[in-house]
Swiss-Prot record:
<feature type="transmembrane region" description="Helical">
    <location>
        <begin position="92"/>
        <end position="112"/>
    </location>
</feature>
<feature type="transmembrane region" description="Helical">
    <location>
        <begin position="153"/>
        <end position="173"/>
    </location>
</feature>
<dbReference type="InterPro" id="IPR042106">
    <property type="entry name" value="Nuo/plastoQ_OxRdtase_6_NuoJ"/>
</dbReference>
<feature type="transmembrane region" description="Helical">
    <location>
        <begin position="33"/>
        <end position="53"/>
    </location>
</feature>
<keyword id="KW-0793">Thylakoid</keyword>
<keyword id="KW-0150">Chloroplast</keyword>
<feature type="transmembrane region" description="Helical">
    <location>
        <begin position="10"/>
        <end position="30"/>
    </location>
</feature>
<keyword id="KW-1278">Translocase</keyword>
<dbReference type="GO" id="GO:0008137">
    <property type="term" value="F:NADH dehydrogenase (ubiquinone) activity"/>
</dbReference>
<keyword id="KW-0934">Plastid</keyword>
<comment type="function">
    <text>NDH shuttles electrons from NAD(P)H:plastoquinone, via FMN and iron-sulfur (Fe-S) centers, to quinones in the photosynthetic chain and possibly in a chloroplast respiratory chain. The immediate electron acceptor for the enzyme in this species is believed to be plastoquinone. Couples the redox reaction to proton translocation, and thus conserves the redox energy in a proton gradient.</text>
</comment>
<keyword id="KW-0472">Membrane</keyword>
<dbReference type="Pfam" id="PF00499">
    <property type="entry name" value="Oxidored_q3"/>
</dbReference>
<dbReference type="GO" id="GO:0048038">
    <property type="term" value="F:quinone binding"/>
</dbReference>
<feature type="transmembrane region" description="Helical">
    <location>
        <begin position="61"/>
        <end position="81"/>
    </location>
</feature>
<keyword id="KW-0520">NAD</keyword>
<keyword id="KW-0874">Quinone</keyword>
Amino acid sequence: MDLPGPIHDFLLVFLELGLILGSLGVVFLPNPIYSAFSLGLVLFCISLFYILLNSYFVAAAQLLIYVGAINVLIIFAVMFMNGSEYYKDFYLWTVGDGVTSMVCTSLFISLITTIPDTSWYGIIWTTKSNQIIEKDLISNSQQIGIHLVTDFFLPFELISIILLVALIGAIAIARQ
């Protein structure tokens, strides 16, 4: 989206605030329904980030798949659960929480130190040199496929990792 600088910055700050407040709501709200709605806000803000980055297809996929399907499924599942189960054995801090926070903090620190040292410019040029010329493609689905593995490789991989985590979480919940 080609916007003037101040408007783009304002929208970026507005989306960041929505993302931060929504993610804090997911973590800290005691009612699972409110947490699910906060998750919907987070996923909606992520799709708006993709629109600001001129990646409209990924934004539409994010909106349809995550907000429209996954979040509605989570809300549907939470509504069928017994609400009193959540408050029976409520501890503020457990050993598992400490281990999880240490693992997440170490992963965050390693990503923060690794990402600035990565040569993203070289990665972009290697994908551009292997790119198929779009005018030779027959259908739009082939063009979308080429864009997903070249121009939108990083968002595509992040979405696939999020789907994998959701699948593993669903399996873990189903086994209990």
